[in-house]
Amino acid sequence: MSSDDIIKLLKAAGWRKVHQKGSHTQFKHSAKPGKITVPHPKKDLPLGTARAILKQAGIQP
C-alpha cells in the first residue's frame, strides 16, 4: 500500500492535513484525539506501518 493510498483513506474518513516537514505529513481529525504521521511520498509502505497507521486512525484495512 502506498502513502498516497493511505492519505486518500484518511481524507475520506475526515482526517485533514495539518503539518508537513520533510518527508512526513501529519493529519488531525476534528472528533478523534491525536495526530497521525504518514511518511510521504513513499511508493510502498511496509505492511506493519500501513496497518499501524490505519489502526490508529480507526480505519479497517
What would you call each of these model-derived segments?
Residues 24-28:
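Minor-groove-contacting beta-hairpin "wing" of winged helix-turn-helix DNA-binding domains
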